[in-house]
Amino acid sequence: MQDWLTLDRRPTLVFGAGGLGGASALSLAARGARVALIDVNQDNLDAVARAAKEAGHEIKTLAADLRTAEACRAAVDEAVGLTGAPQVFLHAVGRNVRKPVLDLEDEDWAETISLNLSSAYWLGQAVGRLMVERRYGRMIFVSSVSGLLAHPHHAPYAAAKGGMNQMFRVMAREWAPYGVTVNAVAPGYIETDLTKDYLDKGNNRESLESLVPAERLGRPEEVADAVTFLASDRARFITGQVLYVDGGRVLV
């Protein structure tokens, strides 16, 4: 039987080496993709590259700060030199500042919007141009349930993810005639460092799990599975969609 999730030697750019980006890079590499992983944090890059090597795969890495348009475009150019023109793109760059609206500083807003939304636009535009030229591409953004739900103390993050959801839909509409699909995965509460930091600050794990119909937190690998599906040709007729990987969180 043919493996419809194979990504044999497909040039793949993954931006963001944290929990979800790193897990997705490993999943894509395991399916045969030729992965370049880009992040500002060298320790994260090294950890994912080691994990890939231990599993018998290779992930090339590139350290880059993605807070300006010029830096994003330069990172794409350099990453293409590592893998070739991308057929798969994943944006998993982001941060969250948890503060009430009245306590937010200007830099909290600017930094969160820049990393979560502006970098998605700059990188998506640069990679999209290459995909449209070649009339093929699988583009995936990591959104969040916060793009739909009104979580207190999440205003910049929610604005960024909500904006991302509309932005990628426009990309999907414009690029569909060129064989480029554009989708997003929207995780709920996942076992990542961000969630660990939240719980370490005295928040109750059981109360968090009680908000999820599945009654548990998700795992990075479960988000990575959704990313891998959307990167494959099995998802060739799916575009402009948000795939919620949240154990039912948006249902309640």
Regions found by a protein language model. Name each.
Residues 3-36:
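Canonical Rossmann dinucleotide-binding motif of NAD(H)/NADP(H)-dependent dehydrogenases/reductases
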Residues 129, 173-177, 236:
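Alpha-helical segment proximal to the catalytic Tyr-Lys
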Residues 184, 207-238, 247:
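C-terminal helical subdomain
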Residues 100-101, 105-113, 208:
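Substrate-binding pocket helix/loop in short-chain dehydrogenase/reductase
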Residues 144:
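Residue(s) in the substrate-gating loop at a strand-loop-helix junction
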Residues 1-3, 149, 228, 239-252:
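Short C-terminal tail/terminal secondary-structure segment
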Residues 124, 160, 168:
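Active-site helix of classical SDR
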